[in-house]
Amino acid sequence: MAIPKKLRLFTLYVDGTNHIGKIPSVTLPKVTRKTEDYQGGGMQGAVAVDLGLDGGALDASMVVGGVVEELILKYGGDIDEMRLRFVGEIYSGGTSSLMEVEMRGRITEIDPGEAKQGDDTNHTYAIKNTYYKLSVDDKALLEIDLLNFIYKRDGKNLYPDRIVSALGLGG
């Protein structure tokens, strides 16, 4: 029986700066599709028609131990100003793999939590991303770039070139 690979170690880079030891947890994007049920005449049931990504599909958050001024100063920046790179070791039964999640976006919320003398002080940052890329052992599994009309799965862009070109989108 194979044991699933579990996250053993991680760090988060923000604009190239490693924040190892400062960030106890990161909530990575819950990538979700927006669908609408459609049932035409003669169909036994409804099918989910894919309408792209849900609003908030690339949202992330991080919990930061204490006050980190450079992160506070990034609040409310340009739409894709901040670059984040989550790097983690996923491990199972003597086998390690490297998992990376690259994101671009901006901080939209800073929650300093409760201030209580003598207690741990964590700040939670909400991040709205425009770019997301998930890789395992340098293999890109999923890449989404909202500003450049890219939606790749296993390296293949799923948007047809002729549609992208006709709409005047993409790079």
Curated annotation (Swiss-Prot):
InterPro entries: Tail_tube (IPR006498). It is found in: Virion. It comes from the Viruses. GO terms for cellular component: virus tail, tube. GO terms for biological process: symbiont genome ejection through host cell envelope, contractile tail mechanism. The keyword Ligase does not apply. Keywords: Viral contractile tail ejection system, Viral genome ejection through host cell envelope, Viral penetration into host cytoplasm, Viral tail protein, Viral tail tube protein, Virion, Virus entry into host cell. Forms the virus tail tube. This is Major tail tube protein. The lineage of its organism: Viruses, Duplodnaviria, Heunggongvirae, Uroviricota, Caudoviricetes.
